[in-house]
Amino acid sequence: MDRLGSARARLVMCTALVLIAAACGSDDKASTATTATTTAAADTTATPATTATAATTAAPAANGTGTTSPDSGLQHETFTTADGTVIDYVMVVPPDREVGKEGKVVFAFPPGGQDLDTTENVVNGRWRDEALKRGWVVVSPAAPESGLYYSDKSAKYVPELLDAIAKQYPPEGGKFDLGGVSNGGLSAFKAALDYPERFRSLVVFPGYSQDGGDDPNLSKLKDIGVAMFVGGEDTGWRQASELTEKTLKDLGYKVELHVVEGSGHIIESLTGADLFDAMERVRA
């Protein structure tokens, strides 16, 4: 990468971290989980971000309208559900990805209020470059007017959107991978627990079940590999994550927990490479 490209990558990452921090600051799901009985090993290393060539062509959305930004590699799409609810979402599609051909697709929930600007900024800062490098499609939905995706009123639309995406870019083996940060991590756990047959992995940074780390419904994740990242200073979320890890390990399921010591709710050292590496390790 030349010096200009390196500077651009650093600027994108720094800008994204500021915007993620602002978004996560509005999260209203503080943890009250029971203190865990185990502590995971710290993971304080991170791979430098990689800048990849942006996608310049893409198929049109399954319904509605879409726009593509060649400079950023991002597509803005609109999906209308059966009941008329409009969902805006952001996509990253590698330039060599063929429409109708199976491949890896990650469905990633944004943090905070899950508005479109936040959604775009997180995709741009955490998912885009590594997805283009590795050939992954990324789909990240902004919340509809019905509310955030950890609520039943909005979570019910997830299967419809997955079906629409699958018509264009079928996920490998018929199952999507799943990601989320903060409120998006809560949303990702809800989607995995509500529709476990649709997913093969779950990566959150951070996230857990709203019913706690000892939620009996975690048994539904038998066929979903789970990787969690949490800041060592993010006390409530760390406790919930540690208890989630213990519950899943006791069930004999595939799970990783990376506690990044010295970090708070926003894990600044975490890169797209870290996220995709974890996803590829745990995916079923």
Positions of the model-derived regions?
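C-terminal motif of bacterial Sec signal peptides marking the signal peptidase cleavage site
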Residues: 20-23
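A domain-start/cap signature at the N-terminus of enzymes
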Residues: 25-26, 32-37, 42, 48-105, ...
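Short substrate-entry loop that stabilizes the transition state in hydrolases
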Residues: 97-103, 108-148, 236
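Gly/Ser-rich "nucleophile elbow"/oxyanion-hole loop immediately N-terminal to the catalytic nucleophile
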Residues: 96-102, 149-183
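The feature captures the conserved acid-bearing segment of alpha/beta-hydrolase catalytic domains
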Residues: 201, 206-280
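Structural recognition of the beta-strand scaffold that forms the well-ordered cores
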Residues: 90, 105-109, 137-142, 175-180, ...
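Short glycine-enriched nucleophile-adjacent loop
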Residues: 185-196
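Bacterial N-terminal signal peptides that target proteins for export
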Residues: 1-12
